[in-house]
Amino acid sequence: MAKAENVEEYVAQQRAYIASNPECGTSHYNLAVALMGQKRYEEAEKEFLEAVECSPSLAEAYVQLGGLCLQRGDLDGCLEFNKRAVHSRAGFSEGWGNIGFVHLQKGNIDEAIHALEKAVRYNPKFLQAHATLANAYLMNGMIEESIDTNRKVIDMEPNFAVSHNNLAIAYMENGEFQLAVEHCDKAVALGYEVAPEIRKELEAYR
C-alpha cells in the first residue's frame, strides 16, 4: 500500500479503496477521520454512517457520530450513538464515559454516576472519566467519594487543575479548610479560574 504524502492524497486513496470495495467499513471510517481533520463535518458524518452500516461493531465510529451530535448541541443524538457504541463492544470505556458526560449535562446524575463507574472500571487509567465521575459525586452530595476519586486523578496527573478545583470545593463542604486552601491555590497556579465566591470564602482560613 502506497503511503499518502498529505491529507488530500490520503482522502483520494481512501475513496479509491471504497470504490473498489464499497462494503469496507474501515475505509469509510478512515476517510471520515481524514475529512474531520479538514473540518468537512457533513461529509465525515456520511462516511461514519456508511462505516457502521458496513461494520456494525465499529464502536469508534459510533463515538465519532456522537461527537458530531454534541458539536451541534444534540445531546439525545450523542447519547444514542454512544449507547450503540457500548452495545457493539463490551467494556468500551470511551462510550461509557461519553454516556456519563451526557447524562451529567442533562442533569441525570444517578445515570451519569452509573455510566462513569463503568467507564473507570473498564479502564482504570481513563483520567477524564475519573474527573467527571468525581464531579458527579460532588453534585450528588457524595463528598468522600468525590474526594477519593479526585485524589486518584491527582495521583495520575498532579497538574490536573479541574480536580484541584473540585477538591477545594469538596474539602470546603467537608469542613477541611486548610486542604481546601491548598487545592484552591494549586488550581489557580495552574491557570484554572476558581469561582470568586470560593476564593472569598477561603480567605478567612489563610
Locate predicted features.
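Structural signature of tandem alpha-helical TPR/SEL1-like repeats
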Residues: 2-16, 38-50, 71-84, 105-118, ...
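Helix-start (N-cap) detector for alpha-helical repeat units in TPR-like alpha-solenoids
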Residues: 25-26, 59-60, 93-94, 127-128, ...
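Non-membrane alpha-helical segments in proteins
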Residues: 26-37, 60-67, 71
